[in-house]
Amino acid sequence: MKLAVALIHGIGDQPDSRDEDGLHSYARELVAALRRRLGAEAGEVTFQSLYWASVLDARELDYLKRIEREPLGWRWLRRAVTLFLGDASGYRKVSAAYDTTYQQVHQHVRSGIMALRAKVGPQTPLVILAHSLGGHIVSNFIWDQQKLNRTPSCSIDPFLGLETLAGLVTFGCNIPLFTFAYEKVCPIRFPGHCLTPAIRQQARWLNVYAPADPLGYPLRPLQNYAAVVHEDLALPVGPWYKRHTPLSHMEYWNDARFHDYLADYLRRLLAAGLEPAGAGRALPAGEPGDRPLAELC
């Protein structure tokens, strides 16, 4: 396989149901749409869903059930707020030794990455598609792994070390909401260190947000993020009756224009993978992805 693609979900209760390919239900329509658009090239791409909802879903849904008979209005909105704030506050890293939720979520992500690695080689370029809170989670996961890596290097298994990370597409991403507690904001190092020059030339962190999505934000205005995020794309998503409403937050997965955007980027990476080793040019200094993390922060 020439390319590995991992998909991570965001807020909301997600069933832990998988198809014969091991894909969770939230990812199936998007993966099917990408395969249709890629045609024969789809055979060069391995997909894997990353699932973490089970860590928090049971607690949130149990509470919602307990308040069913209470005199509460706007229940659909209250449910959405509970699931988002419940996921966000439950996931936060705390110092209490007994609270391991942060580590549990990351272990679920790690398990998905390992399942993907079992299908591809250690040098395979990796693309991560991250929705909503999943963008914050995967950013933290990559950050923690990069701390373990200490210095950029090509280890025995650079894929598991996330040093073959060639693409990151965040959509409906709310990373900015988690930065305001810090005076200095530092992004992950991007792209990975172990990429061929041709793949590195095409490496991109792309951020997509629907203008009506109250949980999707531009990333480049964040301190230091313009050095690693290549594009903030405002893209209305969903059918006409949701496209200009907050409901658009859940519509990226099913939107044809978003599918086209993703497929176009995957094609560029696949084409770069066809170039001989050593082909292509390195990103010149000053372009996103070329400056060491130490220079940014």
Label each PLM-derived region with a short phrase:
Residues 1, 98, 119-123, 271-297:
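Defense-system signaling and execution modules centered on TIR/cGAS-STING-like, death/scaffold domains
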Residues 2-6, 80-81:
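Short coil-to-beta-strand
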Residues 4, 46-48, 204:
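A generic secondary-structure signal marking the coil-to-beta-strand transition
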Residues 5-28, 93-199:
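Serine-dependent carboxylesterase/thioesterase catalytic core
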Residues 12-16, 20-36, 41-121:
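Active-site catalytic motif of lipid deacylating hydrolases and related acyltransferases
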Residues 17, 167, 173-287:
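Lipolytic serine-hydrolase domain surface
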Residues 43-45, 163-164, 201-203:
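A short helix-to-beta-strand connector/capping loop
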